[in-house]
Amino acid sequence: MEAWDVIVLGDGPAALHAAAEAAKSGASTLMMSSTGLGAPGMAALDGLSASLQEANNRSHREDTIRCGAFLCDQDLVAETTAGAIKQVDLLERRGLNFRRDQQGLPIVRKGAGHQQPRTTDAGSATATGLQQIGEEQCMRHGVIRRGDQVPLTLVHTKQSVDGLVALDMVNGRIIGLQCKALIIADEGFEGAFHTGVVGLGMDMAFRAGVGLRDMEFITHHPLTVKGTNVFLPTGLMLDGATLHEASGAAIETDGRSMLDITASISAAVQPVLDARNMGQSAAWWGSLFRLVQQRTGIDMNRQTLPLEPAVGHTIGGLPVDGNGRCVVVRGPGGSPVFTPQATQPARGFTVPLRSAVTVCWTR
């Protein structure tokens, strides 16, 4: 039986950076993904939000709390927004090519739900850039990565994780893996609503006795290509793309939150996205335009694109504390009592470098 210090489930930025940090600290680390490596499903990533041109993070913190309907853990929001600038700087030094202004600083724009310009990106290369940087850090620190490994059962005794049983889809074998700590950082259950990836780590932990929380909270992504599972970043609208009815009537988006934009598109008879007048900014979205043309045959440089809102992210999941630990305390009669400070999905992050976005059982 293989024995590891840390096993990480997932293959997105949260999983990659958690694995890299564990290996950097000297732990033998294994990353496992139930799908092929390098496909975290982040095509709709709009960019990273940080108070780069503000005196402090107060406005960012308040915008995040307001858009979360005051249901967020405000201490965690304050901590995350305060450290956002440092994380953007770290990504830049590691090679992420942000778009820049005339002063050489990353360009910030006013994204949906923000009162101030603070969203920076690299166009359609944002998601792939984050993935590549995470993979480079894993290679640098010696993390072993395996794809097509389906987690089946969590092995635990006396509320301590001992390892897991997984199905090796490459060789068709059932394997047992021993570990001292397990980090669950894979997808949510978005695939239950449309064709896509479903995170199996959450299901495995649930069957082991960990109750899930806030599963009723689901976000709908407004810019989904009708009849497909292709999600378009709302950053397109910051570069000049506009929303219309097929008849030409404009759908207002300025200063509105993502919920309001989604509601407007849902109420429209035949909403379309017009990206034909993006000018020089269209060059930053070249790979996205090619993807849409391959999937639908529509050239976004010449044609409008039909839209329909779809479930983009699931917010609920395993209950964790401020450090991302899944804490389970047994109450009277052996029933589980959870004492978390927050509930976060494995990939629900503003800046995707904090290991706190993962769920970790330790012994």
Predicted regions and their residues:
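Glycine-rich FAD pyrophosphate-binding loop
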Residues: 24-45
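A conserved FAD-binding loop/helix module that cradles the flavin
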Residues: 190-204, 208, 335, 341-363
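N-terminal Rossmann-like FAD-binding beta1-loop-alpha1 element of flavoenzymes
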Residues: 6-31
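Glycine-rich active-site loop/strand segments that organize a redox cofactor
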Residues: 49-80
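A glycine-rich dinucleotide-binding beta-alpha-beta segment and adjacent secondary-structure elements
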Residues: 147-148, 152-160, 166-167, 287-345
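Conserved redox-cofactor binding core of oxidoreductases
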Residues: 92-173, 178-181, 185, 221-228, ...
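An anion/pyrophosphate-binding glycine-rich loop and adjacent beta-alpha core
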Residues: 204, 210-311, 360-363
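Short hydrophobic core segments
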Residues: 7-9, 176-187, 337-338
